[in-house]
Every structure is written in structure tokens, then in C-alpha cells.
């Protein structure tokens, strides 16, 4: 069974989201996603400063098995990317919840209401 930390929020597209003290959201892919994909060999992340809508494909994760889009969980502006993750994408396999991919600042009027909690995500992947 996959690891699903209770303190995070999730999407049904297998991204995890952590709300930071300054209100930005840190986004990564879940343990279930990395396990399903297998050995990750490449990450393409969004550009800092890019405005995105919830559900937009903002990047790509490629593994030896498949390529999959990475989706924005909310509407907002990309404020940071984890360049270390693009340099060593295999680190996501070893620590899916420790290796974040990008940070996003919520757009005015945007919310996190559509994100799901750990219990709902656990049911989704069981």
C-alpha cells in the first residue's frame, strides 16, 4: 500500500499539495504515482511566473515505463520550481513527499476546495 501523509491534500491526478506558512502551495507527485510510473528519468516543470488554471497540464514526468502529465491543482502563478529535481529526477522515487516539483501562489478568488484529503485519496488508490 502507498504512503499517504495525513497532513497533505491531494488531487485525483496523483499530485500532493502542502500549504506553506506564507500561503503558497508546494506540489509534488504522490508515492502511488511514482510507484506506478517506475524509475523516473526526466521531469519537465513549468516556467516561474507562468499563470495557470486548475487542471492545466504544467509539466511532464517520464519514466522507463511511461510519460505522464503533471497538472496544476489550483489556479495561480508558478513562483518556484525545484531545479534539483530536474537534475536528479530519480530522487522522486526515493522520497516522493520530500522532493517537491513546483510552488504556486493562488490566484485571486481561487481556492483549494476541490483538493481531497488523505482518506479520500487512499480510497481512490485502493
UniProtKB/Swiss-Prot annotation:
InterPro entries, sorted: 2-oxoA_DH_lipoyl-BS, Biotin_lipoyl, GCV_H, GCV_H/Fam206, GCV_H_sub, Single_hybrid_motif
Cofactor binding comment, as recorded: Binds 1 lipoyl cofactor covalently.
PTM sites of type N6-lipoyllysine: 65
GO biological process: glycine decarboxylation via glycine cleavage system
Signal peptide from the UniProt entry: none
One GO cellular component term: glycine cleavage complex
UniProt domain Lipoyl-binding: residue ranges: 24-105
Reported cofactor(s): (R)-lipoate
One Pfam family linked to the record: GCV_H
UniProt-listed Gene3D superfamilies: 2.40.50.100
Disulphide bridges, residue numbers: none
UniProt keyword terms in alphabetical order: Lipoyl
General function of this protein: The glycine cleavage system catalyzes the degradation of glycine. The H protein shuttles the methylamine group of glycine from the P protein to the T protein.
Complexes and interactors: The glycine cleavage system is composed of four proteins: P, T, L and H.
Similarity comment: Belongs to the GcvH family.
Protein known as: Glycine cleavage system H protein
Amino acid at each position: 500500500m502507498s504512503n499517504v501523509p495525513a497532513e497533505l491534500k491531494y488531487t485525483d491526478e496523483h499530485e500532493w499539495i502542502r500549504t506553506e506558512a506564507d500561503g503558497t502551495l508546494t506540489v509534488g507527485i504522490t508515492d502511488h504515482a511514482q510507484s506506478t510510473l517506475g524509475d523516473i528519468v526526466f521531469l519537465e516543470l513549468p516556467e516561474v511566473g507562468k499563470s495557470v488554471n486548475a487542471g492545466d497540464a504544467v509539466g511532464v514526468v517520464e519514466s522507463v515505463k511511461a510519460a505522464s502529465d503533471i497538472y496544476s491543482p489550483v489556479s495561480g502563478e508558478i513562483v518556484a520550481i525545484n531545479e534539483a529535481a530536474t537534475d536528479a529526477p530519480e530522487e522522486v522515487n526515493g522520497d516522493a513527499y520530500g522532493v517537491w516539483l513546483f510552488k504556486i501562489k493562488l490566484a485571486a478568488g481561487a481556492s483549494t476546495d476541490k483538493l481531497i484529503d488523505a482518506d479520500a485519496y487512499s480510497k481512490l488508490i485502493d
